[in-house]
C-alpha cells in the first residue's frame, strides 16, 4: 500500500481527510492554488453553478412557486450580462485593435436583423435565436472549463482532450434534438424551424451523451487518483483542475434538464439562462481585475498572518480596492440595464429589432473577445 506524507498509509489519510473542510486552504493541492478566478469556494458556487446544486435548486423553485422570481432575475441579469460585454470591449480598447470583429460585423448583424424583421421573417429570427443560444451557452461552458484546464498546462493527453470536448458538445447536441423532438412547434412561445431527426436518433444521441459524460468523469477520477502523488509533505501535484470537471458537471445537468423540461414548460429554460448569466458576470468581473488582485486572493484562503495588525490593514486595503473596481465594472452593466428599461417604457416598435439584433451581436462578440488573440491585444 502506497505511503503518503512520509509514512501515513493511504487508508489512514482517507480517514483523516473528511475532518478537513472541502474548501480549507490545507485541502487545496499546491499545483491548484494559483489557478482560481477568485477562490475555490467562490468558483464552485458561481462559476460552476455549485457543481449543479444551484441548477437543481432553481428547478425545484419553479416546481414549487412558479417562475415569477426567476423571470425577474433573468431580466436583470441578462441586461447586466450584455453590459459586461461592452465593458470588456471598452476597457481593453478592442474597438481600436479589432475593428472588424467588434464594429463592422456587429453593424452588419444589426442591419440584417432589421431587414429580416421588416421583411416579416420572424420564424427565421426565432430559429436563429434558438440555435445560437444553445451554441453560445455551451461554448461559454467550454471557455470557462478551458480557463482551468490551461492553468494546469492544458489537456493531460489526447484522450483527455477528446473526452472533454465530447462531454461539452454532445450534451449540447442532445439538448437541441430533444427539444426539437418534444416541442417542434414553438420556442419561447414563437414558431421556429425545428431540427427533427426522429425519435430513435434523438434518444440514441441522448444516451450517447450520457455515456460519454460518464466516461469523462470515470477517466478523470482515475487519472486524478493516479496523478495525486505527494512529492514532499504538504505538496500534492495534480494535473486535472477540479474546476474543469465542476464546469462539465454543471454543463451536463443544465443542458440535460433545462431543454428537456423546457419543451413542456418554457420556464425551465430560465434555469439555464440564469446559470449562464451568473457564470458570465462572475468570469468577466474576475478577468477584469488588475493583475495585482490575483497575487494573494486567487485561493481566497491564505495562511493567517502572524501580526494581526498587518492583516487588518491589508484586508481593509484589499476591500477598498475591490470596492473601487466593482464600482467601475458596474458602470456599463448598469447602463445596459437602464437602456433596456427605457426601451420597454417607451415601447417603440422600431426598437424591437434592435433588442433582437443586440442579442445576436452579443453572441458574436462573446465568441470573439475572449480568444487568445483578443486577450493579448
Q: Model segments located where?
A:
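Membrane-interface helix-loop-helix junctions at boundaries between adjacent transmembrane segments
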Residues: 114-200
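N-terminal membrane topogenic signal
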Residues: 32-51, 323
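Short, hydrophobic transmembrane alpha-helix segments
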Residues: 57-71
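Intrinsic disorder/low-complexity segments
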Residues: 1-32, 230-232
Amino acid at each position: 500500500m502506497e505511503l503518503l506524507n512520509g509514512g501515513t498509509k493511504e487508508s489512514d489519510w482517507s480517514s483523516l481527510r473528511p475532518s478537513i473542510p472541502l474548501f480549507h486552504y490545507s485541502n487545496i493541492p499546491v499545483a491548484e492554488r494559483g489557478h482560481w478566478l477568485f477562490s475555490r469556494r467562490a468558483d464552485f458556487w458561481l462559476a460552476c453553478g455549485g457543481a449543479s446544486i444551484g441548477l437543481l435548486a432553481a428547478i425545484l423553485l419553479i416546481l414549487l412557486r412558479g417562475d415569477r422570481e426567476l423571470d425577474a432575475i433573468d431580466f436583470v441579469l441578462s441586461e447586466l450580462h450584455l453590459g459586461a460585454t461592452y465593458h470588456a470591449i471598452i476597457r481593453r480598447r478592442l474597438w481600436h485593435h479589432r475593428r472588424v470583429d467588434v464594429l463592422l460585423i456587429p453593424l452588419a448583424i444589426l442591419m440584417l436583423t432589421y431587414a429580416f424583421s421588416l421583411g416579416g421573417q420572424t420564424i427565421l429570427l426565432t430559429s436563429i435565436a434558438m440555435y445560437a443560444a444553445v451554441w453560445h451557452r455551451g461554448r461559454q461552458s467550454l471557455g470557462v472549463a478551458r480557463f482551468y484546464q490551461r492553468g494546469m498546462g492544458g489537456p493531460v493527453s489526447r484522450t483527455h482532450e477528446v473526452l472533454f470536448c465530447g462531454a461539452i458538445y454532445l450534451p449540447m447536441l442532445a439538448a437541441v434534438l430533444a427539444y426539437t423532438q418534444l416541442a417542434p412547434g414553438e420556442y419561447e412561445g414563437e414558431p421556429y424551424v425545428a431540427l427533427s431527426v426522429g425519435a430513435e436518433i434523438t434518444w440514441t444521441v441522448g444516451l450517447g451523451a450520457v455515456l460519454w459524460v460518464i466516461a469523462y468523469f470515470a477517466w478523470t477520477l482515475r487519472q486524478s487518483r493516479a496523478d495525486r502523488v505527494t512529492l514532499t509533505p504538504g505538496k500534492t501535484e495534480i494535473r486535472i483542475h477540479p474546476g474543469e470537471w465542476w464546469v462539465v458537471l454543471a454543463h451536463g445537468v443544465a443542458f440535460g434538464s433545462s431543454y428537456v423540461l423546457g419543451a413542456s414548460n418554457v420556464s425551465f429554460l430560465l434555469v439555464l439562462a440564469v446559470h449562464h448569466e451568473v457564470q458570465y458576470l462572475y468570469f468577466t468581473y474576475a478577468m477584469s481585475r488588475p493583475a495585482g488582485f490575483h497575487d494573494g486572493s486567487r485561493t481566497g484562503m491564505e495562511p493567517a498572518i502572524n501580526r494581526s495588525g498587518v492583516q487588518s490593514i491589508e484586508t481593509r486595503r484589499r476591500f477598498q480596492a475591490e470596492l473601487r473596481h466593482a464600482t467601475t465594472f458596474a458602470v456599463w452593466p448598469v447602463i445596459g440595464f437602464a437602456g433596456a428599461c427605457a426601451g420597454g417604457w417607451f415601447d417603440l416598435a422600431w426598437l424591437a429589432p434592435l433588442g433582437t439584433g443586440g442579442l445576436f451581436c452579443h453572441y458574436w462578440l462573446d465568441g470573439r473577445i475572449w480568444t487568445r488573440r483578443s486577450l493579448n491585444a
